């Protein structure tokens, strides 16, 4: 097992609209305990879309209703703070992103227990987004867990409801 440093396992550079992006799969290296994933300047096709995330098993996203998550969202809107818990979902979700000029989302995730067949896989996230031309800025911190065992996870898929 490697220790003490970050090792790049996979990278995807997207330059035009795609339905989803998957990291891992055949590029997955199962010799690590923790994986860091970052995405930068992500923009949906349709305005005001939440980023969705699923763990993959055998390169295929797990679409079962076994995703639980909780976030604290901080926005520059009047609401200010928002708690966002959900259970028995078919994906993890992040904050909404805009698609106008200058709008984008960024995040850093840490993935844990991905290679275990007996423990739940889970993640933590730090996310930020400039969401609309009214200058709404959102930040998010939280995490989630896939409450099913039996299969090792080998990656993560990102998508938007609109593609």
Regions found by a protein language model. Name each.
Residues 2-163:
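Surface-exposed molecular-recognition determinants
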